[in-house]
């Protein structure tokens, strides 16, 4: 989520990586509260398809709490299609929620994609696709 988060902001990411974004997005740099939407609303547009979100517990720049809050907030869209919402609390480190069509895990560590992350991605897909 961009509003009220710690770590990476629209201003910092558009300054560091302007080529990743359209120029219009830069007008919200340092003014995230004026965005007409937030990231959980974009994630909700994926419903009812599968969606999987991950966090590293020590990745303060990406803000794992905001990533969890975004996943939890977006899960209401999957509820409209009969899925249970994500639980109210994030999973413990090195575990996750895989049974809903929106899944999430939090791994101990920083900004990375590890073998453990890949194993969790595959478990999520195996659960849903057999």
Which residue ranges define each predicted feature?
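Conserved strand-to-loop "acid loop" that flanks and positions the catalytic carboxylate
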Residues: 47-65, 107-110
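Short, proline-enriched alpha-helix->beta-strand connector loops that line the catalytic pocket
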Residues: 45-51, 98-102
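Mobile cap/lid helix-loop segments that gate and shape the active-site cleft of serine hydrolases
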Residues: 1-42, 67-88
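C-terminal catalytic histidine-bearing segment of alpha/beta-hydrolase fold enzymes
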Residues: 12, 16, 26, 72-130
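Conserved alpha/beta-hydrolase "acid-adjacent" motif
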Residues: 35, 60-70, 114-117
């Amino acid at each position: 989520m961009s509003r009220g988060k710690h770590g990476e902001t629209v201003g910092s990411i558009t300054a560091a990586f302007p080529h990743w974004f359209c120029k219009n997005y830069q007008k919200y740099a340092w003014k995230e509260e004026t965005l007409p939407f937030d990231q959980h609303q974009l994630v909700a547009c994926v419903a009812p398809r599968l969606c999987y979100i991950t966090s590293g517990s020590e990745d303060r720049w990406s803000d794992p709490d905001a990533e969890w809050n975004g996943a939890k907030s977006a899960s209401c869209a999957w509820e409209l299609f009969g899925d249970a919402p994500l639980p109210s609390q994030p999973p413990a480190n090195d575990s996750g929620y895989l049974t809903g069509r929106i899944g999430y895990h939090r791994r101990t560590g920083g900004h990375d994609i590890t073998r453990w992350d890949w194993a969790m991605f595959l478990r999520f897909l195996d659960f849903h696709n057999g």
